[in-house]
A protein has these predicted regions:
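Amphipathic alpha-helical assembly/interaction segments
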Residues: 1-125
């Protein structure tokens, strides 16, 4: 866990394991709202797999037996988040502004997670 602020009243902690879990959960909930087209069904399945994989691999990275294994798992996390972004971009959301905003928010989160995982890899070398 990384400590984000040191205010007197509240200390905010960033738990990356929780953040990756929420990203996967939010992607799953997003898929449930998509129009049921053939392409959305397939893209949705891929999105659920890749977003879940980044969360699972982050948990595995935290249990790594070696630094090499840790870095490898984090690289997989980064790859899976980038893949999730592709599937998010490919989903056809029709005219729903709410779903469009949710899609944009998830894409932004995937960009942030990609940067975080990239920084972890860079600092671990």
């Amino acid at each position: 866990m990384l400590k984000a602020s040191n205010s007197k009243q509240t200390s905010k902690f960033y738990d990356l394991e929780e953040r990756t879990y929420k990203f996967a959960k939010n992607c799953r909930n997003f898929v449930k709202k998509l129009p049921r087209t053939i392409s959305n069904i397939e893209y949705g399945k891929q999105l659920i797999r890749s977003s879940g994989s980044q969360a699972a691999n982050y948990i595995e990275a935290n249990e790594a037996l070696s630094k090499k294994d840790f870095v490898h798992r984090i690289k997989i996390c980064k790859k899976e988040v980038k893949e999730s972004r592709l599937w998010l971009r490919l989903c056809n959301i029709s005219n729903s502004n709410t779903t469009r905003k949710e899609q944009k928010k998830l894409i932004e989160e995937s960009i942030e997670l990609t940067k975080i995982f990239g920084a972890i890899v860079g600092k671990s070398k």
